[in-house]
Amino acid sequence: MLSASANMAAALRAAGALLREPLVHGSSRACQPWRCQSGAAVAATTEKVHHAKTTKPQAQPERRKPKTGILMLNMGGPETLGEVQDFLQRLFLDRDLMTLPIQNKLAPFIAKRRTPKIQEQYRRIGGGSPIKMWTSKQGEGMVKLLDELSPATAPHKYYIGFRYVHPLTEEAIEEMERDGLERAIAFTQYPQYSCSTTGSSLNAIYRYYNEVGQKPTMKWSTIDRWPTHPLLIQCFADHILKELNHFPEEKRSEVVILFSAHSLPMSVVNRGDPYPQEVGATVHKVMEKLGYPNPYRLVWQSKVGPVPWLGPQTDEAIKGLCERGRKNILLVPIAFTSDHIETLYELDIEYSQVLAQKCGAENIRRAESLNGNPLFSKALADLVHSHIQSNKLCSTQLSLNCPLCVNPVCRKTKSFFTSQQL
């Protein structure tokens, strides 16, 4: 029933690898070291084990009353196995992603049924998602730099607003209101805009104020996309070069770079969602920065169900390349800036281990996610600083509805942000 529903496909766009059947059950066969542990996997696993369970992103050092708040928006991910079911339930209840009959009853049923399999995936990557930890580290670095770059709008404070796990977007807004901020910046952590990611988070902000029946006490604006920011591009390029150097020197020029982004149902694309073009823009700028040293392709991961999605799919592309003798592959998560289930499980385990063995690949590695790279924190600070200096409420793109938009809330959200007074 679930896989046949076209409406469910929109929800699966956000859920991605979380809602897929694992390719393996239990322990997999031992893999060659280069397959099991890329630099990305080692760094992510080590950092998570030491820090993920102790980090409290909203707790920041005592300081002067904040003047400017930066709300870092993302889907989020369960930190523990016990949080998986609530995460899935909130996801299936999100009407920006899907509308179903008796949704309030069906969502808990679906979540409960999927929980054991998804918990197993999280168990395989250490017991939970590290995305909250990484967002906290990035936020700390960002506001420290912002206080130096923009003393007129300091002190700056970051807030984390997740859609499906705590701290929820609504909880973050309440904290921001209590803090008495003068200005609030909704800052999506997805470089490329999609209605199902950034759009859903911005809708949550509009809904919060609409439901409480009060106007904001702070002035809102938003950084709603940043696919070609120079420092973002530099970070990706640096991580690609670093990982390319781990391939045997005699094979290095043969490596195919596969930029992998979360796929999207074609029904969403055909409504005019700008996501595919913006991901392509990021890829183009990264390869331009690198000087086109290797062949490359943009591929799409996490397709679920029988309805058409953006392709080619990452796993099918890997199979096809190996069949054609291109067995040295570098995976680059181009739409994700922090490690989570789709990098640590789908790319590192499903593709780099299990699929690599099936295909007889020689070397499959993954470029490390941006995570704790100081240059990435500098990129975030520069984005916010430039946004403040521009005195703009949002990008010009945000004011344009998808030509075939079917969600009336999107129009109200756009009106909410474009009507703010700075």
From Swiss-Prot:
Induction: During erythroid differentiation. GO terms for biological process: cellular response to dexamethasone stimulus; cholesterol metabolic process; detection of UV; erythrocyte differentiation; heme A biosynthetic process; heme B biosynthetic process; heme biosynthetic process; heme O biosynthetic process. Its cofactor is [2Fe-2S] cluster. CDD domains: Ferrochelatase_C (cd00419), Ferrochelatase_N (cd03411). It is a peripheral membrane protein. The active site is at H229, D382. Transmembrane segments: none annotated. Erythroid and hepatic cells. PANTHER family: FERROCHELATASE, FERROCHELATASE, MITOCHONDRIAL. Homodimer. Homotetramer. Interaction with PGRMC1; the interaction results in decreased FECH activity. Interacts with ABCB10 and SLC25A37; this interaction forms an oligomeric complex. Forms a complex with ABCB7 and ABCB10, where a dimeric FECH bridges ABCB7 and ABCB10 homodimers; this complex may be required for cellular iron homeostasis, mitochondrial function and heme biosynthesis. Interacts with ABCB7 and ABCB10. This is Ferrochelatase, mitochondrial.
